Amino acid sequence: MTTSYVAVDLETTGIGTKREKITEIGMVKVVDGTVVDTYHTLVNPYREIPERVVELTGITDEMVKDAPGIEELLPSVVAFCDGFPLLGHQVIFDFGFLTQATVNAKMKFEKDGIDTLKLCRYLMPGPEKKNLGAACAYFGITPDTAHRALSDAMSAHLLYQKLMEQFGEARSELFEAKKLVFKAKKERPATKRQKEHLQDLLKYHRIESAVHIDKLSGNEISRMIDHIIFTYGRVPESAGGRKGKTAAGQSAVPRLFPESR
């Protein structure tokens, strides 16, 4: 059975790894069942955090405005996890975001992992809810703060220990870390022309934006441009418009920018 691991939990602006960003990282390093170290940091997503996410996590724009970006934190995150499998409740979610970030930074992040959600689905009674909060309540675990990264990482660790105590001897094969697989492509960097086009649109339509343009990928800027053109219209050529093209150089496709944005 796997008894040494790093329990991990991330808070993010949403679900998709290509469109959403990390806002908080919590990790708990465990050696032979004993907690030996923890890691916690807020992360600046360089964009506005959606209100529904603020309500869920309590993490606000004000809290992250002076926090480092994920690119600054990756070396310490990767080093903290080095030599250990990951453990988490739906661990592929956390692994996916970290993988996308490391791919963008041209770093490697290959890991084995243990998913406490899958263990709960195998081992808990069918009618019982299997989300982290419900599973912890079922096993008598009281988390410090729900939907905060370090607290949830600790809860996943304690849940795993309870599951091992009750089922490890009879179902030891379920408690072995397995290779985590998540395919991620490096995001295309934004061009100077894209950034200028977006800035022109924001200025002309007097749109206030909390997004840091220099931190956006090319695809993200293209989606923003398409959304602004669809909603507000183009910048007229007489006002310095860029001949009715999107930043990628193609005719704008009328489509709404994703709500999670």
Language model: regions and residue ranges:
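A short, structured active-site edge motif that brings together acidic residues
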Residues: 111-123
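Acidic carboxylate-rich catalytic motifs and surrounding loops in phosphoryl-/glycosyl-chemistry enzymes
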Residues: 146-149, 213
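Acidic, divalent-metal-coordinating active-site segment for phosphoryl/phosphodiester hydrolysis
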Residues: 148-161
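Conserved non-catalytic scaffold segment of RNase H-like nuclease domains
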Residues: 1-111, 125-147
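Acidic two-metal-ion nuclease catalytic site recognized across multiple nuclease folds
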Residues: 162-261
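Short, glycine/acidic-enriched loop or turn micro-motifs at the edges of active sites
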Residues: 12-14, 118, 155
